[in-house]
Amino acid sequence: MAQSTPIFNTLQQLSPFLHRTDNDPRPIVLMTCGIAGSGKSSLSKWITTNHPSFKRLSIDSYVYAHHGLYSVDYPKEKYNDYLDEAELALRDELAQLIRSGDDVVLDFSFAFQTFRNEWKSLVEELGGRWVLVYLDVRADELRRRVRARNQLAVKDGDSAFLVTDEILDRYLAGFERPVGEGEVVLCLDGFAANV
């Protein structure tokens, strides 16, 4: 019998998925999944603040820490190369953290099922337990959040990439929503602006 997908509208409802149990003491790897503006980084930061056993790994933060701001400190043409570099480095860091017994938040978009499956398999091979959290946000709310983020005067790794309406449309059209993948769905309108 298929298990139903948990759908939550508060962060506190997610907390039971963030704890190890006597029956399953493996390190937890929470995988954020969502489109730009859905609140992945806000969720990741909330988790690391409220559940200090978790370490955050973010492709965007890695690129920012190692190369600076998109289109400011390096040319736009280097962006995809730096994303590839970040993914490889974070795979290694994930392996080290799991081997050390740490819990991890992977602050990635995980926009495609094949990519999600690849990382789930990696987590399992390393001895961890994955929790896939899909942040379900309406398209109009995503647009509002992305436009607000684009207007920030101070940029960091989480806000450096300019997401235009056209780019967001491509993201929306190409995103593969997880269905029946063992995901937890989080519906938190207004969350990203409040964390």
Q: Where do the model's predicted regions map?
A:
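Hydrophobic anchor at the beta1->P-loop junction of P-loop NTPases
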Residues: 32
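Glycine-rich phosphate-binding loop used to anchor ATP phosphates in small-molecule kinases
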Residues: 81-130
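Conserved GTP-binding G-domain of TRAFAC-class P-loop NTPases and closely related GTPase folds
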Residues: 38, 46, 54, 140-195
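N-terminal pre-Walker A segment at the start of P-loop NTPase domains
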Residues: 1-21
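Conserved phosphate-donor/acceptor-positioning beta-strand/loop module used by diverse small-molecule
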Residues: 126-146
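Conserved substrate/cofactor phosphate-moiety recognition/catalytic segment
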Residues: 41-102
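The conserved Walker
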Residues: 35-36, 41
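Phosphate-binding P-loop
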Residues: 19-26, 97
